[in-house]
């Protein structure tokens, strides 16, 4: 099921507007933050000028370029892929015209493509195709009408040009914040971890962050639980960001872009064996649906974090 981010955001906004304790401020930019032992404040710039807001905790969910993360001095560890990804959206019906399912992955020795249907404002909906680009090409070349048509036609030849209703080019990273907690500042979503989009794990991982963190914040704020519980949020969600989201999304990309014939044959054989074995198929689905990562997070304890910390100290001594 595809539920675009703008739709989930709209649903959340509608729900928040019904909460008397929530104030929603659009067109505001975070400039700086400061925290004491008892509170944290954030300085923002909005339509009426600069203002300050204070509270018990601050959640930085302000995206991959998070100001909250940077102002908190938290490193964003990982790497950036050399190639950019381009998304081309078209009303062309790949199911009716070519028999494609709603989510398809194409692994060609020369390149790869994702093709999936989104409902948009439909029916009938739209189809999005995603491709890697040549790092040596300029943005103008890639995004030109000629460049866009050449790319989509190379995968899906058609006698007529495709109608392209949206095109987007973006840089892709694999990064995880060094910590999801710094005192009264917490990170969630893309501010805490980013990855390539193959498999749809970024937004879904952020939703899992929100569920985990909100549960713990409620217990700290309303049930007088020790705020050490928030250290567990950091440990649980950072563990799965590294062990599941990063590992799986990188593996997804490498599987699609493999060009060596023997590697490609092994990959396909492995997928066939998985599809033919009910237990392997079940484990594959648990992992790709991120159910397994949620269960892994629930099993992580602060004691495990202490053992890891001690292990790092021993290694460095």
What residue spans do the PLM features occupy?
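Core Rossmann-like FAD-binding/catalytic domain of the broad FAD-dependent monooxygenase superfamily
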Residues: 1-317
């Amino acid at each position: 099921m595809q539920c675009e981010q703008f739709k989930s955001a709209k649903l959340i906004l509608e729900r928040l507007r019904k909460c008397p304790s929530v104030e929603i401020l659009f067109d505001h930019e975070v400039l700086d933050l400061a925290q004491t032992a008892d509170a944290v404040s954030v300085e923002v710039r909005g339509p009426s000028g600069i203002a300050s807001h204070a509270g018990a905790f601050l959640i930085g969910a302000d995206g991959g370029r998070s100001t909250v993360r940077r102002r908190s001095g938290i490193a964003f560890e990982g790497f950036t892929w050399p190639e950019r990804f381009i998304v081309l959206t078209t009303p062309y019906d790949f199911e009716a015209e070519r028999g494609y399912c709603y989510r398809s992955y194409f692994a060609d020795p020369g390149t790869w493509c994702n093709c999936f249907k989104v409902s948009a404002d439909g029916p009938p909906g739209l189809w999005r195709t995603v491709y890697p680009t040549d790092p040596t090409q300029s943005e103008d070349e890639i995004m030109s009408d000629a460049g866009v048509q050449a790319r989509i036609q190379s995968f899906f030849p058609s006698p007529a040009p495709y109608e392209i209703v949206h095109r987007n080019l973006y840089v892709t990273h694999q990064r995880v914040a060094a910590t999801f907690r710094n005192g009264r500042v917490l990170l969630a979503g893309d501010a805490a971890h980013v990855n390539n989009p193959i498999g749809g794990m970024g937004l879904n991982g952020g939703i899992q962050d929100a569920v985990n963190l909100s549960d713990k914040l409620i217990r700290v704020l309303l049930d007088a639980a020790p705020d050490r519980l928030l250290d567990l949020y950091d440990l649980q969600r950072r563990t799965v960001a590294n062990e599941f989201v990063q590992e799986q999304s990188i593996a997804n990309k490498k599987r699609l872009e493999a060009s060596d014939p023997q590697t490609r044959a092994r990959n396909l054989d492995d997928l066939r064996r998985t599809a033919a074995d009910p237990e392997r198929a079940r484990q594959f689905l648990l992992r790709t649906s991120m159910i397994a990562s949620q269960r892994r997070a629930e099993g992580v304890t602060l004691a495990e974090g202490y053992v890891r910390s001690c292990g790092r100290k021993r290694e460095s001594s």
